[in-house]
Amino acid sequence: MRVDLNCDLGEAFGNYSFGGDHQIIPLITSANVACGFHAGDENVMNETVKLAKAHNVAVGAHPGLPDLKGFGRRNIDISNDEIYNLMIYQLGALQGFCRIHQVKINHVKPHGALYQMGAKDREIANVIAQAVYDFDPSLVLVGLANSYLISEAKNVGLITASEVFADRRYEDDGQLVSRKESDAVITDTDEALKQVLKMVKENKVISKNNKEVTLQADTICVHGDGEHALLFVSKIREILMKEGIDIQSL
């Protein structure tokens, strides 16, 4: 049994520091690097790629909507052509830094509202998947388990990784509880660990309404901007190893 452990990193920009990347990155196997639209900038991207390489962590693109103020978590009325182009633009930006540091982009995981839009809307999911395929058909597309991001990525011929969340609660249909709700994020470490083990070992999660939902767990996400992110990552890694589960990149 194996699973990937990923975290969204490189989300500082300019004079604004964000997250504990240097502490978290030695504990994970895949880094989703912000590409400048919702967070990150050219200097942060460069340093994050260098940091990932130094710790033998797989580098992935984390493209988002052009919304620094809202951290890419607000829906934007945007055309399919614009979604396609912003995907290509951000992938190209990260590829430049990967090239000079002689590492390869391994995967792509949309960020925030773009991720949720693709998870719930088949047409948007197809546009995202097609952009990734056109850029590099060997890339892995990471998306919410059981969502349109996964099914549409498979339809266009991409390798997929079904993602589950250690620190998020689920709806009965397998979607994530909206961050607008007060109980959307799990802050209790024991609750998060219990959820992780059930998802990885049983391919199931208990929804907020106490319904058992089936899902595939190829990769576990812990958010680097969370108050308890470092503690979560440390404890999750510890319990996975204790259970004999291999932690490997995608």
From Swiss-Prot:
Asked if the keyword Transferase belongs to this entry, the reply reads no
The alphabetized list of GO BP terms reads:
carbohydrate metabolic process
- Asked if the keyword Nucleotide-binding belongs to this entry, the reply reads yes
Show the GO MF annotations: 5-oxoprolinase (ATP-hydrolyzing) activity; ATP binding
Name the Enzyme Commission number(s) assigned to this protein.
3.5.2.9
Gene3D superfamilies for this protein: Glycoside hydrolase/deacetylase (3.20.20.370)
Keywords annotated in UniProt: ATP-binding, Hydrolase, Nucleotide-binding
Catalyses: 5-oxo-L-proline + ATP + 2 H2O = L-glutamate + ADP + phosphate + H(+)
The UniProt entry's sequence similarity note says:
Belongs to the LamB/PxpA family.
Assembly and binders: Forms a complex composed of PxpA, PxpB and PxpC.
User: What's the protein here called?
Assistant: 5-oxoprolinase subunit A
Organism of origin: Staphylococcus aureus (strain NCTC 8325 / PS 47)
Q: What is the lineage of its organism?
A: Bacteria, Bacillati, Bacillota, Bacilli, Bacillales
Gene it is expressed from = pxpA
